[in-house]
């Protein structure tokens, strides 16, 4: 409701709706923190809405208990997770299903009321949120507020989800027979093959919770979003991807990588926790001589593939730092850990401060699952990659790294010891790898320019703040 003549507008109250699974909420919180800092002069306040378990993890990760570590104009607001109280142990896919069912059944409207109550009755003036939580669109409309979704993955994957219906109509039930066919008839996707599409677009279980979620999201975004934040920077996406998205979503605002939004002295990476001594170990290694290996917190190769990877790292004769969940260590070849520790040629840890590791001058190659956050962290650090994708958008990301941007390689299927050794050797020292290393540095320079004074991502983030706060 507009203020009466002579009355000043109340300060903005932005509800930030998280998808409380995997790393989604943490990524959105980094944006909310940056938004809160940028919007403070306008008197804006932000309510960050997520489930109890999600908020507990965020508090632990950022040492934000009792509000410490959060800007004064950003508050956490707990919302129900949709799970029956009697169910103590619920598998994650079922948790997602219950959460989305609750959101669609009017839950987001109730969450916005909770945000209003937490803000002392201040009306929600804009709803920013993870694009996965598409029911926020209707809730925002009911509250008379614009919906500004945040997309955390790659632009090409977003385009594939928006075009799911036309892709299914084209490919039909022939996905298995057309795996290597380029998607030339779909604007923006000509660089990708049928096999690269995310699970649930033209193959896999269309009724799986994530497949249903992103399909509905892809249908909702073009008709309901006031603007869409993109986790990319000008010059990264191919022109056809950028043009196709601009035609479908006229108000795209690219200001990624999102982890670079916070000022250096405020970011978690300014003084990284390093309980396993990764950075000290890297300090004893040759410049650009180390292969860093990590497949994130969800993806994990099969036991036989883990052993092949370990054998390949040893065969490469390159020093390596491997972040691997401790429950997988018993699957490694006999004596592997002892040999690595005894010679000092390798370090296997249950967790590593990835951003700081990739920025370290000793790291020259990144063996990764090609999750989008990892890809962007590698890009912003200038490190070439060897990608072993597993699911979701990872295949599109790996294709982008190897064939669109040309700063790495991609395994087609499972890793072999010979393939790993060859990839690591090429990225670190190979003749063909020289072009990949140079291209990685070019992309790193583009990121630095985009986030420097007057850079395009800084300008775009300012525009995002204006869109969110002018409502």
From Swiss-Prot:
Enzyme active site: 24, 130
EC number: 2.4.1.115
Catalytic activity annotation: an anthocyanidin + UDP-alpha-D-glucose + H(+) = an anthocyanidin 3-O-beta-D-glucoside + UDP
Enzyme class per UniProt: transferase
Molecular functions (GO terms): anthocyanidin 3-O-glucosyltransferase activity; UDP-glucosyltransferase activity
Record keywords, A-Z: Glycosyltransferase, Transferase
Pathway(s) per entry: Pigment biosynthesis; anthocyanin biosynthesis
SUPFAM superfamilies named in the record: UDP-Glycosyltransferase/glycogen phosphorylase
GO BP of this protein: anthocyanin-containing compound biosynthetic process
Positions bound to an anthocyanidin: 24, 161, 392
Signal peptide: none
Ligand binding (UDP-alpha-D-glucose): 152, 352, 354, 369, 372, 374, 377, 393-394
Protein's job: In the presence of other necessary color factors, this glycosylation reaction allows the accumulation of anthocyanin pigments.
Family: Belongs to the UDP-glycosyltransferase family.
PANTHER family hit by this protein: ANTHOCYANIDIN 3-O-GLUCOSYLTRANSFERASE, GLYCOSYLTRANSFERASE
Protein name, per record: Anthocyanidin 3-O-glucosyltransferase
The species this protein was found in: Zea mays
């Amino acid at each position: 409701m507009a203020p009466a003549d002579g009355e000043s507008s109340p300060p903005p109250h932005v509800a930030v709706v998280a998808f409380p699974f995997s790393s989604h909420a943490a990524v959105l919180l980094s944006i909310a923190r940056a938004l809160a800092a940028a919007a403070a002069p306008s008197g804006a306040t932000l309510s960050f809405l997520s489930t109890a378990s999600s908020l507990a993890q965020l508090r632990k990760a950022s040492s934000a208990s009792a509000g410490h570590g959060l800007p004064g104009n950003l508050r956490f607001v707990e919302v129900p997770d949709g799970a029956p109280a009697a169910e103590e142990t619920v598998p994650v896919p079922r948790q997602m299903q219950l959460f989305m069912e609750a959101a669609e059944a009017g839950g987001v409207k109730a969450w916005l009321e909770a945000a209003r109550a937490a803000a002392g009755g201040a009306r929600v003036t804009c709803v920013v949120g993870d694009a996965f939580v598409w029911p926020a669109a209707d809730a925002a409309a009911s509250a008379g507020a614009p919906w500004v979704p945040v997309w955390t993955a790659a632009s090409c994957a977003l385009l594939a989800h928006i075009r799911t219906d036309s892709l299914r109509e084209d490919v039909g039930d022939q996905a298995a027979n057309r795996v290597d066919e380029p998607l030339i008839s779909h604007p923006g996707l000509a660089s990708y093959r049928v096999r690269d599409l995310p699970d649930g677009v033209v193959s896999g279980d269309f009724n799986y919770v994530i497949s249903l979620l992103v399909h509905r999201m892809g249908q909702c975004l073009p008709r309901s979003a006031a603007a869409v934040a993109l986790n990319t920077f000008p010059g990264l996406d191919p022109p056809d991807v950028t043009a196709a998205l601009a035609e479908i979503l006229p108000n795209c605002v690219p200001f990624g990588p999102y982890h670079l939004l916070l000022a250096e002295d405020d970011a978690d990476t300014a003084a990284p926790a390093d309980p396993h001594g990764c950075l000290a170990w890297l300090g004893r290694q040759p410049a650009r001589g180390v292969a860093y290996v990590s497949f994130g917190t969800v993806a994990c190769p099969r036991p036989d593939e883990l052993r092949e990877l370990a054998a390949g790292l040893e065969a490469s004769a390159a020093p390596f730092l491997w972040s691997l969940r401790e429950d997988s260590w018993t699957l490694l070849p006999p004596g592997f850990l002892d040999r690595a520790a005894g010679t000092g040629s390798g370090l296997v840890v249950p967790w590593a401060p990835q951003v700081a590791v990739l920025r370290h001058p000793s790291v020259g190659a990144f063996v990764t699952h090609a999750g989008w956050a990892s890809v962007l962290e590698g890009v912003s650090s200038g490190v070439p990659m060897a990608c072993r994708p597993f699911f979701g958008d990872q295949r599109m990301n790996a294709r982008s790294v190897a064939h669109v941007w040309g700063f790495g390689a991609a395994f087609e299927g499972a890793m072999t010891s010979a393939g790993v050794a060859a990839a690591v050797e090429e990225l670190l020292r190979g003749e063909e790898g020289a072009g990949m290393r140079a291209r990685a540095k070019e992309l790193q320079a583009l990121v630095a320019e985009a986030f420097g004074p007057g850079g395009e991502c800084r300008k775009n983030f300012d525009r995002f703040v204006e869109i969110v706060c002018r409502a």
